[in-house]
C-alpha cells in the first residue's frame, strides 16, 4: 500500500504506456470495425466535412459525429498509422481513468485507494480490449463516466449555485454522449440515478434542477442536429427507428442474444479481478444505508447492466460503461479486506488467475500442436506463435501464484497478470485469422495489382474499408453483398457503387476498357472460388481472401 501511495502516479503511467501505447501500432487493424472507423475519419478529413459521415462515398447514418471527431483529430495529428486509428479510443480510456481517480478521491480522500481503483480499471480485460480497439464505445463510456461524476457532484453540492453548475456539467456530458452514440447516452444516466434519488430522497432536486441538464444537453447538440437535418433530412428518421428501436427492442434486432448474455462477458471482462466481483457487489448492497456512496456506485453498475441485458441486441462492448463504477466498488472492497486482514477474497482472486493462466496455456498447447483433430487453429509453420501463447498465459498464471504468497500480501500484483499477454497478443493470432479478419496483410501482399487498378470491388464491407484505408481511395465498389451499406446504397447518387452478381460480367467487360479491375472476395472456410465468376488474368489466394485481377483490354 505504501508503494501505491508514494509512487502511484508513476506506476500508473508506466502501466498505461506498456499496455495502451507501446503495442498498438504493431497490431493490424481488424475488420469490420477498425477499418470502418479508420476510413470514415479519413474521408471526413479528405472532404473537410465534419457534419455528414460518409463511408466509401456512401452516406453512413449509423452513428452521430462526435466519436468520429475524436478519430479525425487523432489522424490529423498522428497521420495514417494504426496508432492514429486507435488513439481516439486510447485517449478516451485515459480520460475515463482520470475520472475514476478523481471520483475515488472525492469519495474516500485516500490516495492509495484512488490509485488502486484506477489500476483496477485500466487492467480490466474488457477495458483494455475495447480501450485499444478503434470503436466508439470508449468515447461513450467516457461521457457516461463523466455523467456519473457530475451526478455525484450534484449530490454533494452545498448550495443552489453548486447544484446548477453540477447539473450543467451533467448536461454537457449527456450531450456529448448523445452526439457520440445517440439516445443511449440519455437513457443510461436516467436509469442509473433513479434508485439513488429514491434512496437519498432527492427526487425534488432532480425535478427542480434536472431541466438544467436537459437544456445544456440540447444546446450543445442542437447546432449539429439542425445542420445534419438540413443537409440530410432522412438522418433522424433512420437513426432513431433503425439504429435505436430496431436494434434494442424489436424481434429483428441485430446481434440478438439471451438475457444472460452479459454474465459470462462480465466475468471474463473483469479479469484479473474476478475474485473480487461477488464481494464488491454484495458490499455495495449490504452497506447501502451506512455507506451511500457504495450504493451510488452499485446503481451505476447494475442498472445499466440490466438495461443492456433486457435489450434485444447485445454486444460485449455495450457494458464498458459499467466498468468504471465497478472498479471503484472493487477498490473499496479490496482495501477493506486488506485493512481488516480478511484475505479470503484476495486469495481466491489469486487462485482464479493461477488456474486461468494454466488452463489457457494448456488449451493453446493442445490446439496448437493439433491434438484435437476437429480444431485447427495454427498451421505447421506457426509453432512460434503457439509457444509465445503458452509463455503469455504462463506469465499470467505465475503472477497469479505470486499474489498468493505470504498470505496474499502481494495481491495488488494481480494487475500485472495480463501484461505478457497484452504485449504479445498481436503476435499470437493464427495466420488464417489474420488473412480473413485483418486485411492489411493481404492488401500489402497484393498492393501492386490493387493500386494500379482503375476499379476495385469486394463482397465484404469490412474488407472494402480496409482497401479504402490502405489505398487511400474512397471509390471501392461493393460486389454482390451490400451489408451495412444497404441504406446508403439506396440513394440514387450511390447506386453505381454496387455491382450485382448478375450484372458483373457485363459491367466487367465495359470496365476493363478503362483499366485494370481487381475483385477481392471473402470465402467461407474451405470454400473454392465461385465458378460463376469470369476467369481472371491472375488469382492470388490467401486462406479466406482471394484477389481476382482482370487486366485492361484493348
UniProtKB/Swiss-Prot annotation:
Compartments, record wording: Cell inner membrane
Induction remark: Activated by low magnesium concentrations, via the two-component regulatory system PhoP/PhoQ.
Gene that produces this protein: arnT
Record-stated family: Belongs to the glycosyltransferase 83 family.
Annotated InterPro entries: ArnT_tfrase, Glyco_trans_39/83, LipidA_mod_glycosyltrf_83
Superkingdom classification of source: Bacteria
NCBIfam families given in the database record: PRK13279.1
Pathway(s): Lipopolysaccharide metabolism; 4-amino-4-deoxy-beta-L-arabinose-lipid A biosynthesis
UniProt name for this protein: Undecaprenyl phosphate-alpha-4-amino-4-deoxy-L-arabinose arabinosyl transferase
Mode of membrane association: Multi-pass membrane protein
Task of the protein: Catalyzes the transfer of the L-Ara4N moiety of the glycolipid undecaprenyl phosphate-alpha-L-Ara4N to lipid A. The modified arabinose is attached to lipid A and is required for resistance to polymyxin and cationic antimicrobial peptides.
A single GO molecular function term of this UniProt record: 4-amino-4-deoxy-L-arabinose transferase activity
Keywords: Cell inner membrane, Cell membrane, Glycosyltransferase, Lipid A biosynthesis, Lipid biosynthesis, Lipid metabolism, Lipopolysaccharide biosynthesis, Membrane, Transferase, Transmembrane, Transmembrane helix
Sequence intervals crossing the membrane: 87-107, 115-135, 178-198, 206-226, 262-282, 293-313, 315-335, 351-371, 384-404, 414-434
Organism the protein comes from: Yersinia pseudotuberculosis serotype I (strain IP32953)
Disulfide bonds listed in the record: none
Catalytic reaction equation(s): 4-amino-4-deoxy-alpha-L-arabinopyranosyl di-trans,octa-cis-undecaprenyl phosphate + lipid IVA = lipid IIA + di-trans,octa-cis-undecaprenyl phosphate
Main subcellular localisation: membrane
GO process annotations (BP): lipid A biosynthetic process; lipopolysaccharide biosynthetic process; protein O-linked glycosylation; response to iron(III) ion
